[in-house]
Amino acid sequence: MKSDLDTGIDYTVNLVTGDKDGGIWVVTQSQAVFYYNPQTNKLINYLSDQSGRLKFGSLGQLYFDSDNVCWLDIRDGNLYFSKDKLQTLVPVFPKDGNEPFKGEYICKLLPGPYNCMYVGTITGLKEVNLTNKTVRTLLSKDESGDDIYVREIAFYSDDELWAG
């Protein structure tokens, strides 16, 4: 299947997820984000130039929260959100040199209670307070002093977060 830019999904796929409207989102590492609308049977290419290549260096994770806000990791040291299906990307942190995820490989994004986003990375688990734009490290080292690789996170309740 070809997209609106006459490109198919040809590169490493990082994630496939759905949204509240029944659409399917495919995040590729270096090509684009694709949206498949099952009602219209159309594949739409987002975040790429007219040649079908990604406008950014590399994409990581994408997550739709309960309000259908899209959260995206572009692997440039920042997190982004979009309330209009990736038409507009808003950085969580201002472009003032504060790049708390610079050099990180983000494995999982999970919005949580108290206006926080939980971020699993290859060096641990971090909590981003979206109100005051602060980052708190929750897990970083194991008993032997090695980095903790957090690939998956899930809430059991508002007060209990599981990481693996």
Positions of PLM-derived features:
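Carboxylate-rich, polar loop motifs that coordinate divalent cations or form catalytic acidic clusters
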Residues: M1-G164
